[in-house]
Amino acid sequence: MNKNTWIIGFTLFAMFFGAGNLIFPTQLGLESGHFFWPAILAFALTGIGLPLLGVVVGALDKHGYIGSFNKISPRFSLIFLIIIYLTIGPLFAIPRTASTSFEMSVTPIAQNSGNLALFIFTVIYFLIVLYLCLNPNKMIDRIGSLLTPLLLITIVAMIIKGFVDFSGHSSNYGMTNAYHSNLSGFSQGFTQGYLTMDAIASIAFSMIVVNAIKTTGIQHADKIFKQTIIAGLIAAIALVFIYISLGYIGNHINIPSDTLKELKAKDQNIGTYLLTTMATKGFGTFGKYLLGIIVSLACLTTACGLIVSVSEYFHRILPKIPYKVFVIFFILVSFILANQGLNSVIKMSVPVLSVIYPVAITVILLILIARFIPTKRIAQQIPLIIVAIESILSLITTQGWIRISFIDDLPLKEYSLEWFPIAVVATLVGYMISYFVKQSNIVYQKE
């Protein structure tokens, strides 16, 4: 394993590690109580396992997901990738990184921070993103060898101090009845990890990893696949360590019930409160600044990864427009949306994400199956169409636009996984139908 693989692995970690990856495991630790271990391990399984799988599957074809999706349908490839890149890019995730950085780094320090402060912060934030992203090859090196070590050092410093301050406390009793057994703890952790939606980002980040590996001189798909697995494992190990550590500390922070009630009444994020408590307990007033640095670095690296992946994709389908033009354009769009505030960005994006997320996971699994089982195009098309229809109907019901009664009765609906049994059945039906259809089997390009 050479130096480049380590740099790519650490870059992948940094791109995946956003502010939510700090908040979710810490809050899970508090809520799970005595059932922490099954909850956090299940959280890691879906919160890390699915994104890692998404990155690795993207390396099965020499041309990444573009090549794999084209085998399903060139039209599907174009439409679905445009939706994914715009949704997790300038229309949602990138503006959210800036808004989250502001709310967790500036707001706690400057009590009266308003629209002007947000404007100034986002100008500086996106100028840094612009500098890092204008050259995508240098971006990998800058993040992997500079920003990631700085991010890891600050996180580890807070974790070590957190262990010293809180590990002597007894495990709390949890704050919700959802955790009442090892099985319920596992199912809750599994669902929370799934709901991070990092698997969608893996489709975008996979292209960066594949292209970065190609720049080292590796061109054969099998070797690219092997290096992608190694880089993915490096990122996964770092994420597992941080998730379990933050979750463990959160599990040993005892918050009075009155404080919890007050937080809920104010609709304040409990995970953010726990992180602030951990930072200020360990480092006093400086803790607020330390947490701000950690969150800003985490969000900055994620924003860079998304800007590069989105810009590279659109430059690929519209080669007459230079890559740098796309970078500037998407940063401007993200800047405008970031100044609408965090809550506005989230409200706009959640409905779209709830539709494309099941389709994204389904297509990742279908491509993986096709790697080992002879598969015709129609065997992938049928389950994708059915899952997309179910996801749209589920959204319509959830939003209250039209009441579709059978949607609420679907298995696993309470875990937001009602699409999964449907995907399994549709896949089996698709493979059965494919036996009667004259199509050649899908072959992923290696040379």
Swiss-Prot record:
InterPro entries xref list: Brnchd-chn_aa_trnsp_Livcs (IPR004685)
Membrane spanning stretches: 5-25, 40-60, 74-94, 114-134, 143-163, 193-213, 229-249, 290-310, 317-337, 350-370, 382-402, 417-437
Keyword Cell membrane among record annotations: yes
Keywords: Amino-acid transport, Cell membrane, Membrane, Transmembrane, Transmembrane helix, Transport
Gene Ontology molecular function terms on file: L-isoleucine transmembrane transporter activity; L-leucine transmembrane transporter activity; L-valine transmembrane transporter activity
Topology of this chain in the membrane: Multi-pass membrane protein
Cell location: Cell membrane
Gene Ontology biological process terms from the UniProt entry: isoleucine transport; L-leucine transport
Gene3D superfamilies: Amino acid/polyamine transporter I
GO cellular component term, pick one: plasma membrane
Known role: Component of the transport system for branched-chain amino acids (leucine, isoleucine and valine), which is coupled to a proton motive force.
Family: Belongs to the branched chain amino acid transporter family.
Entry-linked PANTHER family: BRANCHED-CHAIN AMINO ACID CARRIER PROTEIN SAOUHSC_01411-RELATED, BRANCHED-CHAIN AMINO ACID TRANSPORT SYSTEM 2 CARRIER PROTEIN
This protein's name: Putative branched-chain amino acid carrier protein SE_1090
